[in-house]
Amino acid sequence: MSQPDNHSSRSASVSRRTSETDISIDLNLDGTGTHSISSGVVFLDHMLANFSKHAQIDITLTCKGDTDVDDHHSVEDIALVLGSALLQSLGDKKGIKRYGWSMIPMDEALARCALDLGGRSYSVFNATFNRSVVNGFSTEMVEHFFLSLSRTLHANIHISILEGQNTHHKIEAIFKAFAYALKDAISISGTGIPSTKGVI
């Protein structure tokens, strides 16, 4: 996997190829939310486009996966590569706010996300869905997406659905809540490492 293109630009390019998926991603943390996403899973494209737009992170992502089997490998591996790219683009994390949280409504649904970019991978997910599949996307993969992302981003991510019935609304609210929480956490608020340890 590549290193950040330039520390000051907070960008990264990462690729990963296995017998199940072939993924490449370019991102810029300090972008405007422009995106070109082709994951092979249409509903995931929609969620990642929302993430890019609301986090204001520029993303170009392509994935060729074994979706003839199911969506599991593509969704999981995209999360792993996205987490790696986000981590690399953060560099030494000097000056970042580190913590972020958001609460986002979408009609009857209400999602909350809180996260810590302090280097400790952990994921807590509290949400249930009325449908098992949305347009080829297995709803059980929402939790697995954020678990996989937390591992390679080295982040602590807590996600909860507080209200809601419609499965699409709940999932979209989750991705948007994560977007705003991450946007908050990666924002520059100082010059040093935000930890008494001196490293995160």
Curated annotation (Swiss-Prot):
- Which GO cellular component terms are attached? cytoplasm
| Cystine connections | none
One Pfam family cited in the UniProt record for this chain: IGPD
Indicate whether Lipid biosynthesis appears among the record's keywords.
no
- For this protein, what is the EC number? 4.2.1.19
Keyword list, A-Z = Amino-acid biosynthesis, Cytoplasm, Histidine biosynthesis, Lyase
Q: In which pathway does it act?
A: Amino-acid biosynthesis; L-histidine biosynthesis; L-histidine from 5-phospho-alpha-D-ribose 1-diphosphate: step 6/9
Q: Which GO terms describe its biological process?
A: L-histidine biosynthetic process
Primary location recorded for the protein, binned into one broad class: cytoplasm
What this protein catalyses is: D-erythro-1-(imidazol-4-yl)glycerol 3-phosphate = 3-(imidazol-4-yl)-2-oxopropyl phosphate + H2O
Q: Which InterPro entries match?
A: IGPD_sf, ImidazoleglycerolP_deHydtase, ImidazoleglycerP_deHydtase_CS, Ribosomal_Su5_D2-typ_SF
Q: Where in the cell is it found?
A: Cytoplasm
CDD domains xrefs: IGPD
Q: Name one GO molecular function term.
A: imidazoleglycerol-phosphate dehydratase activity
Give a yes or no for keyword Lyase in this entry: yes
Q: Which family does it belong to?
A: Belongs to the imidazoleglycerol-phosphate dehydratase family.
HAMAP family reported in the protein's UniProt record: HisB
Q: NCBIfam families given for it?
A: PRK00951.2-1, PRK00951.2-4
Q: What is this protein called?
A: Imidazoleglycerol-phosphate dehydratase
- Tell me which species this is from: Prosthecochloris aestuarii (strain DSM 271 / SK 413)
Its gene name is hisB
